[in-house]
């Protein structure tokens, strides 16, 4: 079971796998709050039982990529644009999802 959960999380590393948060953000330019929430919840569950370096590296990568997407969105010289951008989504990223992912980087699984 844990291996299936890990593989599901790692699917986000391949931004060509439809139905993942990263596919939505990178390929469709849509920040899907439901997929981000699901990703965070699955990562939290997995890391509560496993101190997995590969998943923690994935979280660091996701944080970096999302930060870059918001930065590119705000750069008028950049072609990347988040189609469904809203201040609410960016606020939730800054105040809910990103802090939670950073917290998960620090926890040790059982």
Where are these regions (language model features)?
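Short, solvent-exposed, charged loop/turn and helix-capping segments
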Residues: 41-57
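Alpha-helical rod/repeat scaffolding segments in eukaryotic adaptors/tethers
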Residues: 22-29, 52, 83-87
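Amphipathic alpha-helical binding modules
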Residues: 63-110
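Sequence/structural signature of long amphipathic alpha-helices
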Residues: 56, 60-64
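Short terminal alpha-helical segments
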Residues: 1-40
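Generic alpha-helical secondary structure signal
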Residues: 3, 34-37, 41, 53, ...
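Generic structural signal for well-ordered, non-membrane alpha-helices
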Residues: 14-15, 34-45, 64, 68, ...
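Intrinsically disordered or highly flexible coil/loop and linker segments, enriched in small
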Residues: 15-19, 52, 75, 110
